């Protein structure tokens, strides 16, 4: 009897479950604000309507405020959901509002975009 196939299947399942067990959440609260897995501050944009499923920040706006991108297989978790952008890519949303990074933030914990033009805010 060939024992390779069951062994290979067992190994594959073990690796899959190990990966799931160590998966990090897409974002978490740290220092009183929402940050991504790298510790970079996440922001919301006042022109985005909560629950609309759309981002109003595209083109040049998205160059300065990069969307917090979600993987194709990303699943909602808690207050985090996923919206589909105009270009078909997926973006994380917090309480229904798309979330973004700020290009001028250079290291984890930076929050230099808070209240930028009175329309960008850190997520608290």
Indicate where each model-derived feature is located.
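Bacterial N-terminal signal peptides that target proteins for export
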Residues: 1-9
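Bacterial N-terminal signal peptides
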Residues: 10-18
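Compact beta-sheet-dominated domain cores in extracellular/mature segments
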Residues: 2, 20-124
């Amino acid at each position: 009897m060939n024992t390779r196939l069951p062994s290979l299947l067992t190994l594959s399942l073990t690796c899959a479950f190990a990966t799931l067990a160590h998966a990090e959440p897409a974002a978490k609260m740290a220092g009183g604000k929402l940050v991504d897995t790298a510790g970079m501050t996440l922001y919301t944009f006042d022109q985005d309507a909560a629950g609309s499923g759309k981002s109003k920040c595209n083109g040049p706006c998205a160059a300065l405020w990069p969307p917090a991108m979600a993987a194709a297989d990303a699943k909602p978790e808690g207050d985090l959901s996923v919206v589909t952008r105009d270009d078909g890519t997926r973006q994380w949303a917090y309480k229904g509002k798309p979330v973004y990074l700020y290009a001028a933030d250079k290291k984890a914990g930076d929050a230099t975009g808070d209240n930028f033009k009175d329309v960008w805010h850190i997520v608290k």
